[in-house]
C-alpha cells in the first residue's frame, strides 16, 4: 500500500471536520512535520489551528483552549511570531493583570513592526509615542522574546 505524502495528509485533514479536536491536533502535528520543507505552509496550518481552536473555546471544552495555547507556543517558538508569544506568555495571568491582550487592538500595528525586526525586514525601528502608551513594557517583552531566541 502506498504511503500518503505530507501534502496528501494535509489535504485530507483540511477536508475533514475541523471542529473535531483530533483533526485539529493532527493538523498542528502536520504543521510541525512540514516545518523544515515548507515554513510558510507550516505557519498557515498552525494559524488555522490557532483561530479554529480559539473559536471552539466557546464550547466550554478546555481541550480546545489547551490546543489554542499549543498553537501559540508552536508559532512563537518555531516561527518566531511575536504576537503569539505575547498572547502565550500571559495566558496564566489574571485577566485584569494582562498587558497585551486588552491593548492588542491598539498596539497590534506596533507588534507587527517589531515582528519585521525579527524577520530581518527592518534594521532599525524608531518608536515615538506619548507617555503611558506601553512602549517600555512592550519593549521589555520584545527583549525577552529576542533573548529567548538568541541567548548568546
Language-model region placement:
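Intrinsically disordered, low-structural-confidence terminal and linker regions
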Residues: 1-43
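Phosphate/NTP-binding elements of NTP-utilizing enzymes
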Residues: 30-40, 47-57, 61-152
